From Swiss-Prot:
The protein, known as: tRNA (guanine-N(7)-)-methyltransferase non-catalytic subunit TRM82
GO cellular component, one term: cytosol
Physiological role: Required for the formation of N(7)-methylguanine at position 46 (m7G46) in tRNA. In the complex, it is required to stabilize and induce conformational changes of the catalytic subunit.
Gene name tied to this protein: TRM82
Keywords, sorted A to Z: Nucleus, Repeat, tRNA processing, WD repeat
Pathway(s) this gene product operates in, as recorded in its UniProt entry: tRNA modification; N(7)-methylguanine-tRNA biosynthesis
Coiled coil: none
Superkingdom of origin organism: Eukaryota
Single biological process term from Gene Ontology: tRNA (guanine-N7)-methylation
Location of the region described as Disordered in the Swiss-Prot/TrEMBL record: 51-102
PANTHER family per record: TRNA (GUANINE-N(7)-)-METHYLTRANSFERASE NON-CATALYTIC SUBUNIT WDR4, WD40 REPEAT PROTEIN 4
WD repeat windows: 105-145, 244-291, 296-338
Gene3D superfamilies cross-referenced by the UniProt entry: YVTN repeat-like/Quinoprotein amine dehydrogenase
Length: 520
């Protein structure tokens, strides 16, 4: 089966008065003109993008943008001297080339893509190598990598401070630290390791003291890799630890709140984790001070969203069958909104009883869509809230009223599972990236062909007899959907690549605890 990479991330931004689109397709970032959809640049350059069914020279791996690490000790190999072994030598060379192919492809996904407020920098995280990369964007759309920093623990959320000078990075193990967007002086800190004790590592727990199957598996893992439990690595670049969770961190946003006593807004760091917690901490200079918590979820929290028109409201969602709207400064639940009941959007004013046989919900995105540029829409609502569920081919739509309450609207039906949403303007126009590889509503079954289906769909909010969403069209979406040759994955590698695509697109449901009834 031949297929195109789906667009897993898409961003709309303005760079020096020019509107651009940044899209992630597989292992690459592509910059498009937001008006025409023409491709302006791509990273990595085409010369470094290895075709999956072709061979490359082994000396290109270091120039493909992978993070520099201390070289391993090399073993000297003596070439064969027997002239009759030319065929064997040629076969050996091909084997080395195949190994170099595997070594070069240090990542296959780009899970995080953030645009600076000025639009001239992009921060991205490449998947398998856990490398945080900063790019410069020119008005002509040219993308140039400026820095790369390998993170010891996998980054799961990135945010930029309002001055666009500092990156806040949250990692898989719950730590949040700050690092400069563009370090002035290259400071390389040695990787620090915890001192090894004279006694061999021995977990404090035993098979007689653990009480759950989950803890037993964790103990067995520690016993299998005792040295890994002793070793703790820290970033080898300039950074400052701000705060930490005792659970896996899932999302992070930086929330500025207008202050009555000063001209500059007060900053807060809002973080969520796998253990149903939402923490509100003070800004980077006082991040050790916890302002409060927003407690009310009963499953993991995967996504946070603050509408730009109401900075004191927070909308959160994850593994529960509802989203929650908070007065986050007070830590108070303002509204609980059911998401799905028997496959239909539930009314926002009624609580639906949970059903044991209902499919598990995993919120993959919460998006705030502004209406400020469309007076006809602002008569009905301050903006729109769209919720994407993992493996669901529709967007759940809500209106955000002037009273701060959400009201459910008819869902937006898509041609494939929703992957990402971006607002194109402040008049209620959006682009939705959809999964062109899997069948709608499934994360396992594949389409017969992934070349024909759309990569992007465009929708606009209408106020005819009430607020609703209708499909529309843009030149950019039409042009991008018609692109084929540059995106096609080779037939010989499609099976392996489809599995990688599935893993990269649908991983939020894995945050759910292993089984109901087990402790956290």
């Amino acid at each position: 089966m031949s297929l195109r990479y789906p667009i897993s991330r898409i961003r709309h931004f303005r760079c020096q008065l020019r509107e651009l689109l940044a899209a992630v397709a597989g292992p690459s970032i592509r910059i498009f003109d937001a008006g025409t959809g023409s491709l302006l640049s791509s990273w990595p350059p085409a010369s470094y993008m290895r075709p999956l069914d072709s061979e490359i020279s082994p000396d290109r791996a270091s120039s493909a943008g992978t993070c520099a690490e201390p070289p391993e000790k090399r073993r000297k190999l003596t070439p064969p001297v027997d002239e009759s072994g030319e065929a064997q030598t040629e076969q050996s060379a091909k084997a080395k080339a195949r190994k170099s192919q595997t070594a070069e492809q240090a990542w296959s996904t780009i899970p995080i893509l953030v645009i600076s407020g000025t639009g001239d920098h992009i921060v991205a995280v490449t998947g398998e190598d856990k490398c945080l990369r900063v790019f410069e964007v020119k008005q002509d759309g040219k993308l140039t990598q400026l820095t790369e920093r390998c993170i010891p623990k996998r980054p799961c959320a990135i945010s930029l401070t309002p001055d666009n000078n500092t990156i806040l990075c949250g990692d898989k193990f719950g730590d949040v630290y700050s690092l400069p967007l563009l370090p002035r002086d290259e400071v390389v800190l040695p990787l620090r390791k915890a001192a090894e004790s004279s006694k061999p590592f021995q977990p404090s727990a035993t098979k007689l003291t653990v009480h759950t199957q989950r803890n037993l598996k964790a103990l067995e893992q520690q016993l299998r890799t005792p040295r890994a439990a002793q070793e703790k690595l820290e970033p080898s670049f300039q950074h400052r630890l701000l705060l930490g969770h005792v659970s896996m961190l899932t999302d992070l946003i930086l929330a500025p709140v207008p202050s009555d006593s000063s001209t500059s807004p007060r900053l807060y760091i809002i973080t969520s984790d796998r253990d149903e917690h939402i923490r509100v901490s003070r800004g980077p200079s006082q991040a050790h001070i916890i302002h409060g918590y927003c407690l009310g979820h009963t499953s993991f929290v995967s996504k946070l969203c603050i509408p730009p028109w109401d900075p004191r409201s927070l909308i959160s969602g994850g593994g529960d069958n509802c989203i929650i709207c908070w007065d986050w400064l007070a830590g108070r639940v303002a509204q609980t909104i059911p998401l799905v009941h028997d496959g239909d959007v539930a009314e926002s004013t009624k609580a639906q009883p949970p059903q044991s046989d209902a499919p598990d919900i995993a919120v993959s995105g919460i998006y705030a869509i502004p209406f400020s540029g469309n007076p006809g829409l602002t008569e009905h609502a301050s903006g729109g809230i769209l919720v994407a569920l993992e493996g669901v081919s529709r967007l759940l739509a809500f209106s955000f009223g002037t009273n701060g309450r959400l009201t459910a609207l008819a869902p937006i039906e898509l041609s494939g599972n929703a992957l990402d949403v971006v607002a194109l303007d402040d008049r209620g126009t959006i682009l939705v990236s959809v999964d062109n590889v899997h069948k709608p509503g499934s994360t396992k079954e594949l389409r017969d062909s992934a070349i024909g289906p759309k990569l992007l769909q465009c929708f606009s909010a209408r106020s005819d007899g009430g607020l609703k969403w209708e499909e529309s069209s843009t030149q950019a979406a039409t042009t991008i959907n018609s692109r084929e040759a540059v995106d096609i994955i080779a037939e010989t590698e499609s099976r392996k690549q489809v599995q990688k695509i599935s893993d990269s697109l649908y991983g939020i449901g894995n945050l759910r605890k292993w089984a109901r009834g087990e402790d956290g």
